[in-house]
Amino acid sequence: MSILSFPDRGKWGKSSWRGNCSGHIYRELFERLQPGVFIDPMVGSGTSVEVATEMGIEAYGLDLHSGFNAIRDSIANAVGKPGDLVVSHPPYGGMVIYSGKVWGDTPHPDDLSRCVDDDEFHEKLQLVLLNQRDATKTGGFYGTIIGDWRRNGTYTSYQAECIARMPKSELAAVLIKAQHNCQSESSSYRNMRLPFILHEYIVLWQKKGVSTLVLLSNLAHEQYARLTGTWKNVVRAILVALGGEAQLKDIYEAVAKSAPDKLVTNDSWQEKIRQTLNQNPSLFASSSRGHWQLAA
């Protein structure tokens, strides 16, 4: 069945942790996909890992609250082995503010619930998904649990944007997850003609045996007009994979090694990388000539 509904969240994790996903959802995924190794890069209160461990699955949970940053740190390096299933459940749209509210006393700059706008969120979540893909075995599955949001007359479909920003050749399934016990002000929806959103999506991709950079470069060519942030994420993904900093020549080499022929034969691709590095000081910093790193 592609529609999942579990009113009871189960015994796993913390019921007080707002936005926590029902453990029955994870159990359903594990029963279907039978992963030997499961990774959750945004584990929150630990529901997913508790379910996996109970089912005898080798599980790894990472999170901002334990010092792991899915935007800046390599999931593959942190875990030390690839996963059969790598699934995240990010905070989105500011509906549930994570850092400084659910966890910790102060806001975290890479907390996805604190993005300044949807554009920033879309770019950052794409980078997280690419990070998840890199940590997934060939033939394994990676994905995210995410919903939509309507506010101030604007409907944002986060799952549609995720699908548009990831390789269509790897999209494996979109499951609908019913939402229960949502916190909302009923008066806010009294005069609405359109229904209140009571569902999320579980979007799954199956990794094929090609590099993330090949897929990204294809996306850059196919959707250049729409995805202006793709080149930034190509360079960011390279720097994450190289440990957060690298010589310009090493960045070139990584692109040349992984990119398709139509990219490496383009006379301007090195110029595009330099342009991306130089025009985005909030993302990239140079400590010396030819040496680049992720901005603090």
Which ranges hold each PLM region?
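Class I S-adenosyl-L-methionine-dependent methyltransferase catalytic core
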Residues: 1-276, 286-289, 294-296
